[in-house]
A protein has these predicted regions:
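Select subsegments of transmembrane alpha-helices in polytopic membrane proteins
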Residues: 14-24, 90-99
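Membrane-interface helix termini and inter-helical loops of multi-pass transporters
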Residues: 34-44
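Alpha-helical transmembrane segments
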Residues: 45-61
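Membrane-helix interface/capping segments
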Residues: 64-84
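Cytosolic juxtamembrane regulatory segments of multi-pass membrane proteins
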Residues: 87-95, 151-167
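Alpha-helical transmembrane segments and their membrane-interface junctions
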Residues: 99-121
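Alpha-helical transmembrane segments and their immediate juxtamembrane interface regions
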Residues: 123-159
Length: 167
């Protein structure tokens, strides 16, 4: 796979996960607060959905943050730009698409159980995706790339620190 394909894969996976999660949360909030249709589960069912959704959200968030903490230093230590990019693309794809699935599942639990707490947990998961979004400079720092490697990847889109000092 070519280097540009890895960067496109990183952007596409992150955008799909982030915008899908944001759309799911917004649609759930609209359905939950604006829609005239309601589900009325029993109190027992509602409580179990709240517990299951909360446990799922907390486990998914903690595992995602743990994976970010453990994987990024390992990727930085690896040799070769191709290896770093392929590992990072796989890491971003699994992180964002897994969190998209978790957010959608939490939103389904929110609609079926009518629990506002689950909607807030879905918003926290989406906020985590926003904060972990891989832009050009974040990729440089997380993978430990040099300015030459970044210019070979992004061309004119990348502005090195030395370029700003000259102007």
């Amino acid at each position: 796979m070519e280097k540009q394909d890895y960067t496109k894969s990183i952007k596409r996976s992150a955008a799909t996960g982030l915008w899908g999660s944001a759309a799911a949360v917004i649609l759930t909030a609209l359905f939950h607060f604006v829609s005239p249709w309601r589900f009325y589960p029993s109190q027992h069912t509602s409580r179990w959905m709240l517990i299951a959704g909360a446990v799922l959200a907390v486990l998914a968030l903690s595992m995602s943050l743990l994976v970010i903490r453990k994987q990024i230093p390992a990727l930085r230590q690896s040799e070769g730009l191709e290896t770093k990019l392929s590992g990072y693309a796989q890491h971003i794809r699994s992180l964002y698409l897994t969190m998209l699935a978790v957010v959608v599942l939490i939103c389904v639990f929110t609609v079926l159980s009518a629990q506002n707490v689950l909607l807030m947990l879905a918003m926290v998961a989406t906020l985590m995706l926003i904060l972990a979004y891989p832009n050009i400079y974040r990729i440089k720092v997380e993978l430990g790339l040099t300015d030459e490697e970044m210019k070979s990847l992004y061309g004119d889109q990348y502005i090195a620190d030395g370029d700003n000092a000259e102007k």
